């Protein structure tokens, strides 16, 4: 688990750079301005959480369930949030919007919020 978390963080980071470049160059002509902004939001959130996963992976000892749950929230939440945005944007650009992905984005966002809340709780619990 200790090496898996920074590995996933690095993978998410690498994919964020690839998707960001793809969006900025290849999709700029295909996407509307709103679709491009949505796609960029997915890329930004993916990169933020990729960096966070690398940092947590090297700083957590994974001796508690709380640390494990925090990391799972960020891994799963990032995947659901960002990749559902990519799917929505790409499908809409092709004229076939995958409506099933619509509810997945806020679920991913909620899981990210839970991860941040658990991380905050872990800091407060250490102080108290």
How should these model regions be labeled?
Residues 11-21, 37-62, 75-83:
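Core segments of alpha-helical transmembrane spans in multipass integral membrane proteins
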Residues 99-113:
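Individual transmembrane alpha-helices with interfacial aromatic-anchor signatures
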Residues 19-31:
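Hydrophobic transmembrane helix segments
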Residues 79-95:
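Transmembrane alpha-helical segments of integral membrane proteins
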Residues 1-14:
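Hydrophobic transmembrane alpha-helical segments in integral membrane proteins
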Residues 1-4, 31-40, 59-69, 93-103:
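Juxtamembrane loop-transmembrane helix junctions in multi-pass integral membrane proteins
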Residues 117-128:
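Juxtamembrane boundary at the C-terminal end of a transmembrane helix
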